[in-house]
């Protein structure tokens, strides 16, 4: 009995494995057939070359704020604009010289802290820019020595 069962099991296992392999290959050919039937364009993926744009290069509209402070306390508002990544043109013509100098000192520190830049663009007029704004070129102006010594 044992020898007969062993032979029977031996031959029956081969048959089962063969059937299993046959089913396996049948599934593979069925999967290949399904892949061939799928359309070339998938709705989730665009066909062809993809154009990728960095999100950092797409910005909201940039703003330039014009400010004409009358007192030193308004310097903090200007600094807040710079922290919000907005360029600010500061006109200091209507403020006393000592107050104007304090404002320029305060804004210089603010601009340094955020990695920006401050430039004099006219008599008592300054351009303060955050790090996301690049200023190119210069404005040449004939300034008398008295005004030049003021700053």
From Swiss-Prot:
<comment type="function">
    <text>Cell division protein that is part of the divisome complex and is recruited early to the Z-ring. Probably stimulates Z-ring formation, perhaps through the cross-linking of FtsZ protofilaments. Its function overlaps with FtsA.</text>
</comment>
<dbReference type="GO" id="GO:0043093">
    <property type="term" value="P:FtsZ-dependent cytokinesis"/>
</dbReference>
<feature type="region of interest" description="Disordered">
    <location>
        <begin position="23"/>
        <end position="53"/>
    </location>
</feature>
<dbReference type="GO" id="GO:0090529">
    <property type="term" value="P:cell septum assembly"/>
</dbReference>
<dbReference type="Pfam" id="PF04472">
    <property type="entry name" value="SepF"/>
</dbReference>
<keyword id="KW-0963">Cytoplasm</keyword>
<dbReference type="InterPro" id="IPR023052">
    <property type="entry name" value="Cell_div_SepF"/>
</dbReference>
<keyword id="KW-0717">Septation</keyword>
<comment type="subunit">
    <text>Homodimer. Interacts with FtsZ.</text>
</comment>
<dbReference type="InterPro" id="IPR038594">
    <property type="entry name" value="SepF-like_sf"/>
</dbReference>
<dbReference type="InterPro" id="IPR007561">
    <property type="entry name" value="Cell_div_SepF/SepF-rel"/>
</dbReference>
<keyword id="KW-0132">Cell division</keyword>
<comment type="similarity">
    <text>Belongs to the SepF family.</text>
</comment>
<protein>
    <recommendedName>
        <fullName>Cell division protein SepF</fullName>
    </recommendedName>
</protein>
<feature type="compositionally biased region" description="Basic and acidic residues">
    <location>
        <begin position="24"/>
        <end position="39"/>
    </location>
</feature>
<dbReference type="GO" id="GO:0042802">
    <property type="term" value="F:identical protein binding"/>
</dbReference>
<dbReference type="GO" id="GO:0000917">
    <property type="term" value="P:division septum assembly"/>
</dbReference>
<keyword id="KW-0131">Cell cycle</keyword>
<dbReference type="GO" id="GO:0005737">
    <property type="term" value="C:cytoplasm"/>
</dbReference>
């Amino acid at each position: 009995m044992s020898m007969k069962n062993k032979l029977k099991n031996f031959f029956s296992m081969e048959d089962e494995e063969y059937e299993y392999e046959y089913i396996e290959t049948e599934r593979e050919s069925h999967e290949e057939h399904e892949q061939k039937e799928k359309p070339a364009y998938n709705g989730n993926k665009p066909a062809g070359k993809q154009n990728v744009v960095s999100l950092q290069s797409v910005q909201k509209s940039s703003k330039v704020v014009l400010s004409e402070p009358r007192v030193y306390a308004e310097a903090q508002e200007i600094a807040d604009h710079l922290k919000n990544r907005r360029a600010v043109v500061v006109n200091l013509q209507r403020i006393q010289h000592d107050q104007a100098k304090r404002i320029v000192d305060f804004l210089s520190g603010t601009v340094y802290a955020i990695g920006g830049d401050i430039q004099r663009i006219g008599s008592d007029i300054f351009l303060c820019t955050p790090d996301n704004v690049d200023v190119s070129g210069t404005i040449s102006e004939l300034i008398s020595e008295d005004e030049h010594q003021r700053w």
